């Protein structure tokens, strides 16, 4: 069964998790990594089960912790080609590898 949770949504940050068979994907990382971990724990999700992060776009309220997530976990961050093109400066600012 698929489990999901809205970890937060709004102008201050956005993040969602989807889990199936103890494997998860994180959609957006608009909070600090510490806040994301806390929100996951508070909602009964395991941070270590995250396989990858998918970003809807590169505004900070969706991608704030993307660079930190990638560097600390070594896991992939996926961004659509259109978002990459439109957000070249944001990729640098967010330090996404």
Language-model features, listed with the residues they occupy:
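Conserved beta-strand hairpin/beta-sheet module of binuclear metal-dependent hydrolase folds
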Residues: 1-43
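Short secondary-structure boundary micro-motifs
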Residues: 1-2, 8-9, 60-62, 87-88
């Amino acid at each position: 069964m698929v489990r999901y949770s809205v970890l937060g949504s709004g102008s201050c940050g956005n993040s969602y998790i989807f889990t199936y068979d103890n494997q998860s994907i994180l959609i957006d990382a608009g909070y600090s990594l510490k806040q994301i971990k806390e929100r996951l724990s508070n909602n009964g999700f395991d941070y270590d089960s995250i396989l990858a992060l998918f970003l809807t776009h590169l505004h900070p309220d969706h991608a704030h912790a993307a660079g930190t997530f990638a560097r600390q976990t070594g896991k992939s961050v996926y961004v659509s080609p259109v978002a990459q093109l439109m957000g070249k400066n944001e990729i640098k600012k967010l330090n996404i590898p």
